[in-house]
């Protein structure tokens, strides 16, 4: 289908959806539709930080370390507020919103490390959006066809 325009909202509140299966809310960095919504706090809070981060947070009193020390130790492994990488990550979500319309409803790719990969971990997000922000062969072809 031909995409002449689409509507996109950047949200500064956490955006969540309720999962009927596990009966809990999940932060969603992007909800595609009309309009598509990209939530900056959900980019930061949604995808999980490394397991070691949570492990140390649980044991910080036992280990005699502060939350700030743990944050500093793991800073390169997750996106935080005022993070210079946040713009690149948000751009990746804009690309996903565009592909939602180009594919008639499928903004994600199951092939890691495509930029459209649905990252559930911060480290995946950083790799696919900052360190290696490229589309897989299939999505590059789809993009080329859309431009014709």
Label for each model-derived stretch:
Residues 82-100:
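ATP/nucleotide-binding catalytic cores
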Residues 26-85, 102-148:
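Metalloprotease/metallohydrolase-associated module, dominated by Zn2+-dependent proteases
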């Amino acid at each position: 289908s031909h995409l002449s325009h689409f509507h996109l909202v950047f949200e500064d509140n956490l955006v969540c959806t309720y999962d009927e299966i596990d009966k809990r809310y999940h932060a969603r960095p992007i909800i595609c539709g009309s309009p598509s919504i990209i939530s900056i706090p959900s980019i930061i809070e949604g995808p999980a930080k490394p397991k070691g981060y949570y492990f140390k947070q649980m044991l910080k009193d036992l280990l005699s370390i502060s939350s700030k020390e743990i944050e500093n130790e793991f800073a390169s492994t997750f996106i935080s507020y005022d993070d210079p990488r946040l713009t690149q990550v948000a751009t990746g979500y804009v690309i996903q919103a565009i592909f939602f319309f180009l594919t008639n409803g499928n903004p994600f790719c199951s092939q890691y490390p495509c930029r459209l990969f649905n990252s559930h971990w911060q480290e995946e997000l950083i790799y696919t959006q900052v360190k290696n922000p490229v589309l897989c062969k299939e999505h590059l072809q789809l993009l080329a066809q859309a431009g014709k």
